[in-house]
C-alpha cells in the first residue's frame, strides 16, 4: 500500500480522495457506502481533514452511508475539538478494546462517550479474566446506549498470522514465504499447522 509521508503530496491526494467519496456518496442511490479512516490521528492532525470528517459524520447517513474512524488512542478524538462532538454524537455503535492504560483517567472518557456505570464496568473488565488455554481477546460493543456487552473474539491460526501486527511474527511469515517462492498463503498454512501441533 502507498504510504503518504510527502508533505506536499498528502494534501493533494487527500482532496482527491475526499472529492471522489463525496461524488460517489451523492451519486450512488440505494447503495451502502462506507468511509473508513484508518490511523485517524494522521487525518485528525490536519484542520482541513478534521473539518471534512465532521462534515462526513453529519452528512453520510442521509446518503445510506457510514463513516468509521479507527484509532488506537482515544486522545486522538478527544484532542480534536472539531471532530470530538460530531464523531461521538453521530456514532450509534462504539467499539472499544482493552482500556486498562486509561484506567486512571477513565472518568473523562466515560463522560465524553456518555457511558453508564454498567458500561464502564464492562469496558474495564476486558481481558481481565481470559481463559489461558484459549487464544482470544475481548472487545466491548455498545449500540446506541440501549445494548452493550463484552465479546470474546477468537480467530483461526491462519487468520491470526495473516493480520498480525507483531513484527517478529510478520518477519517469520515473510521469511518462510521467501523460502517457498513468495507464496505467503503456503507460509501461513505451514506456520499455523506448526502452532497447532505445538499446543
Label each region the model flagged.
Residues 2-121, 157:
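Conserved P-loop NTPase motor cores
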Amino acid at each position: 500500500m502507498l504510504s503518504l509521508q510527502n508533505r506536499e503530496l498528502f494534501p493533494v491526494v487527500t482532496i482527491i480522495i475526499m472529492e471522489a467519496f463525496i461524488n460517489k456518496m451523492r451519486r450512488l442511490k440505494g447503495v451502502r457506502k462506507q468511509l473508513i479512516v484508518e490511523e485517524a490521528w494522521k487525518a485528525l492532525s490536519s484542520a482541513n481533514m478534521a473539518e471534512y470528517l465532521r462534515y462526513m459524520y453529519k452528512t453520510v447517513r442521509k446518503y445510506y452511508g457510514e463513516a468509521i474512524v479507527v484509532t488506537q488512542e482515544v486522545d486522538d478524538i478527544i484532542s480534536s475539538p472539531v471532530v470530538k462532538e460530531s464523531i461521538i454524537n453521530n456514532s450509534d455503535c462504539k467499539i472499544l478494546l482493552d482500556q486498562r492504560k486509561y484506567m486512571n483517567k477513565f472518568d473523562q472518557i466515560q463522560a465524553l462517550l456518555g457511558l453508564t456505570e454498567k458500561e464502564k464496568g464492562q469496558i474495564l473488565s476486558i481481558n481481565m479474566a481470559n481463559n489461558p488455554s484459549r487464544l482470544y481477546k475481548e472487545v466491548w460493543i455498545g449500540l446506541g446506549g440501549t445494548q452493550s456487552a463484552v465479546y470474546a473474539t477468537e480467530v483461526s491460526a491462519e487468520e491470526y498470522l495473516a493480520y498480525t501486527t507483531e513484527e517478529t511474527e510478520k518477519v517469520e511469515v515473510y521469511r518462510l514465504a521467501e523460502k517457498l517462492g513468495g507464496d505467503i498463503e503456503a507460509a501461513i498454512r505451514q506456520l499455523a499447522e506448526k502452532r497447532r501441533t505445538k499446543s
